[in-house]
């Protein structure tokens, strides 16, 4: 496996992981309100990513659970799992075993520092009737992926995430609500149809829900990251 070089470009990479780990690409962001015109394309893209990668996402989660007890290995797998939307945002299929790539472990210091700062910020926001916690969570939601994607430290990642989501936080919140409602409706209709055919088929709807709920959630984060980060204007 090739060594990691921060100055390496995606074009010179030898495998898919190099395309989205530590490439130090120039920071880019969308304009405030950008997600308004991208609302439906983002939602549809989330479903597209989820359908294409649902099995890989679920298997990766299962592999993470099965290996969570292994010291040191669990550091890399946890980082890989938490930043999975970064891989999916490049429109490339993923393998469930990608979580075992050793290069994820080299980011553990900045990643967990970023996570700790995010948790502290959300808890502080929760003291003020809860709503600020949601704002902070959305504002900093891209930070863990930015640590890997841009090779920045925790402070820089949080700052960049806030800039990328500026002016789009409310629409991101509505996107998650829309995903939750639409997925609930789709699963409800599917379950009703199966139940009308035979009561025993209801487990298929439950199985589908177990697969699609995490897959669509990860897919939406990937679709949002794709649109907010990979744009032409620099964050200000």
Task: Label each PLM-derived region with a short phrase.
Residues 1-45, 94-96, 229-236:
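Low-complexity, intrinsically disordered extramembrane tails and loops of integral membrane proteins
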Residues 31-52, 95-105, 155-166:
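A short amphipathic helical element positioned immediately N-terminal to and/or at the very start
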Residues 48-62, 108, 166-174:
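Membrane-interface helix starts
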Residues 102-126, 172:
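Alpha-helical membrane-spanning segments of integral membrane proteins, especially the hydrophobic core
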């Amino acid at each position: 496996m090739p060594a990691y070089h921060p100055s390496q470009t995606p074009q010179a990479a030898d495998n898919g992981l190099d395309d989205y780990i530590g490439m130090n690409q120039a920071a880019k962001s969308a304009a405030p309100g950008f997600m308004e015109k991208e609302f439906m394309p983002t939602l549809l893209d989330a479903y597209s990513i989820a359908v294409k990668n649902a099995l890989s996402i679920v298997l990766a989660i299962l592999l993470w659970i099965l290996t969570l007890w292994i010291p040191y290995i669990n550091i890399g797998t946890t980082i890989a799992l938490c930043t999975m939307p970064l891989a999916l945002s490049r429109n490339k299929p993923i393998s469930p075993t990608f979580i075992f790539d050793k290069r994820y472990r080299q980011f553990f210091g900045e990643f967990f520092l970023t996570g700790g700062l995010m948790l502290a910020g959300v808890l502080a926001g929760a003291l003020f009737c809860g709503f600020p916690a949601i704002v902070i969570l959305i504002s900093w939601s891209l930070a863990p992926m930015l640590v890997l994607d841009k090779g920045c430290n925790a402070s820089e990642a949080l700052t960049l995430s806030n800039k990328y989501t500026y002016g789009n936080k409310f629409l991101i919140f509505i996107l998650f609500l829309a995903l939750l409602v639409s997925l609930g409706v789709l699963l409800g209709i599917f379950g009703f149809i199966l139940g009308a055919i035979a009561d025993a088929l209801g487990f298929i709807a439950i199985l589908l829900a177990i697969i699609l709920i995490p897959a669509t959630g990860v897919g939406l984060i990937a679709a949002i990251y794709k649109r907010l980060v990979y744009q032409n204007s620099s964050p200000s």
